[in-house]
Amino acid sequence: MAKREKLLKPRQAIAKMDPYRPPSSGRGGKMRLDFNENTEGCSPRALQRLKGLGGDTLAVYPEYEEALPQLARHFRVAPNQLTLTNGTDEAIQLVVNTFVNPGDRVLIPRPTYAMYRFYAQVMGAEIVEVDYRKDLSFPLKELMSQINSRARAVFIANPNNPTGSSASPAQLRFLLRAAPRAAVLVDEAYFEFSGQTALPWMDTYPNLFVSRTFSKAYGLAGLRVGCLFSNETNIAAIRKGQSPYSVNVAAVAAALEAVKDRAFIRRYVGEVRRARAMLCTELTRLGWKYFPSDANFILVDFGPHARRMRDALGEREILVRDRSYELPGCVRITVGAEAQTRKLVSVLRSATKGVAR
């Protein structure tokens, strides 16, 4: 019998990782309040542009020469201060690949978006996670205590996911000054709902990076497109290590139309903010604790009833995200349109009546 060949061994950093398996099926036809997506879809203008793409366009590699200046004008930056990315995930990966070596220290608040830890682990970095405070406010002092000469990256989601809380401009500026040798990424995936941005600071802080996505307010999550911003020198370095065609033609075309349809974004964001206020009012009336949010979701503390409340919503085909594995008793609920929120509230009322407290 032939001797069995030895299997290849992955790098130690990969071997030590736990696989990341987000829910990826069984969501069709349901009220999707679990992934913080736009619950109504993308701009009709973007959809029409996608329908108009011809075979000749799809047959060639994407070109970004015209897209970058148009997006730069929209975001009020220079074309050499941004690069297109395959969603926020690639933006995170590019910052790690460009500025972090194996063994370097990466600071990440906890809980937060899982991909910060994911890409730092792939690199083999030393990951230091700093817990948000009990009231889920930003742990500035705790982060500061972990900054040392080996700190090469700090990842801040602002507003944060899943807490919905934000670091103040003063706190972010303090952190940027305190970690001059680290790439500080401020992930503004939920900017449209909060209105707070660090983009104007790029000329002041050479270690600042900002990411934006078209997956949330713009309703283009399925196309995977975003932007990474920093000063000209940083972006030149980022582009050196970036795949030349990481963002596809359809994604670029849709993004360019999406930013032109400002009325669509204003209407949707305004509706979500009103629905968020409606949901908070109802949660208070029902006696459920929740955490104030600057994003398009609310983190609700159902305590020992978290699973029961999640399942009650699921039975009515309303999907929510149980975050009890990192915040005991907490469920994250995406805020959609007002009509969707009224249906959600109706189910919450019914489910609450069946819970003994």
Predicted stretch roles:
Residues T98-I156:
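PLP-dependent aminotransferase-like
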Residues A170, D311-L319, S324-R357:
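PLP-dependent enzyme catalytic core of the Aspartate aminotransferase-like
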